[in-house]
Amino acid sequence: MSRAKRIVICGGGAIGVAIAYFCSRRGARPVVIERHAVAGAASGKSGGFLAFDWCRDSALDQLTRRSFHLHADLAAELGNPWGYRRLATYGGYAIENDPALGPGPRPWLAGRVAITGRLGSPRTTALVEPHAFTMGLMRAAQAHGAELQRGVIAGLVRRPGGAVVGVVLEGGELVEADAVIIAMGPWSTLAAQWLPLPAVFGYKGHSLVFDTGETIPAEALFLEYQEASGEVLTPELFPRGDGTTWICAISTARPVPIDPADVAPDEGAYARLEAMCRNISPALAAAPIRTRQACFRPVTEDGLPLIGRVPGVDGAYVATGHSVWGMLNAPATGEAMAELILDGAARQVDLAPFAAGRLRALDPA
Ligand SMILES: Cc1cc2nc3c(=O)[nH]c(=O)nc-3n(C[C@H](O)[C@H](O)[C@H](O)COP(=O)(O)OP(=O)(O)OC[C@H]3O[C@@H](n4cnc5c(N)ncnc54)[C@H](O)[C@@H]3O)c2cc1C
């Protein structure tokens, strides 16, 4: 009987744990190595919004449609401890200094917010609580035999011919593997020191989580909001099944600190976000703020993720750069990576558009 493949997954975000889950379900032995905390970066702080067909004119379309279905399946199979729910989604706008016109059709929204149309129905849009989703998938993977190890990936173990056969942790420990996957979100760019990989950048986003109880119905909102200064923000507001409401705005290109624990907000960003929330919603103005948070989403030069083999290096794989759709696309990425590593090719989605070799590799110096 052949021995189960040992697969080292660098990074315990949604992408890493989804790969661990699908590999473990197939009888492999994945080990997730995480520096800070599972779901401790964007995968625990993001919006968790899912859309079936919002990538229809992009190379992401097939991945996204597959993933939307897998989210429903995973919630059903694993008891939905992450509040997966379908909901309608609307778009609109507001101007900070517009006089409030009295309550509109939605009493929880200020009268100055104009809803301009429906962007999605419960058939096409859904939501998960991302921290619970990422933790839940990690636990499900562990139930199938996956391991979680705390450690900082500091290098790779190579055979004389160049094949990757493990990782080196800070402190010197070696962890052997039949396959190594770089899934460290924006920190994946560190792996370009060891592998021919393109740059992965980080875009910072700020968000607040309010305890809104029953005051906000199950409707997601995408707004354009003009501040008194004239600057336009594009807030997204997602009411969750657990009685909280997540809202974000203010994305900035900032250097990513080496240690994910050191991610900090831009000066003044939370105050600006809180002022906006008071302005658009009396329900938010009255609700306690449970969490103020900032995180980086991973982005490549052309906006598409890197999913597949590292070109020219046996045993090395990459899965990162999912930008604004990492929570949505985690399941189909996990499934495809498990197929690629265990069967030699992905069957459900074509990974060709996501090949790392399409972009120029960083100079390892
Ligand atoms: C504000 C905001 C809102 C978003 N909203 C949505 C949304 O509504 N829907 C959606 O689909 N997507 C959304 N996204 C995008 C989504 O959150 C990301 O694409 C996704 O979380 C990326 O997951 P990841 O696993 O690649 O990276 P991460 O979540 O960043 O995980 C990477 C992990 O690697 C670890 N790591 C780093 N360095 C090392 C090292 N040296 N050794 C070991 N481990 C290391 C980190 O600690 C981290 O846990 C949003 C993103 C942001 C910023």
Residues covered by each model-derived region:
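Flavin (FAD/FMN) cofactor-binding and adjacent substrate-gating region
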Residues: 73-151, 155-163, 168, 299
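Conserved FAD-binding subdomain of flavin-dependent enzymes
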Residues: 22-25, 35-89, 96-107, 228-230
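Predominantly flavin-linked oxidoreductase catalytic cores and closely associated redox partners
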Residues: 128-217
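N-terminal Rossmann-like FAD-binding beta1-loop-alpha1 element of flavoenzymes
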Residues: 5-31
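Residue-level detector of alpha-helix initiation sites
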Residues: 13-14, 37, 324
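Active-site substrate-recognition segment that forms the wall
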Residues: 21-22, 48-50, 82-85, 186-312
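C-terminal catalytic lobe of FAD-dependent flavoproteins
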Residues: 279-365
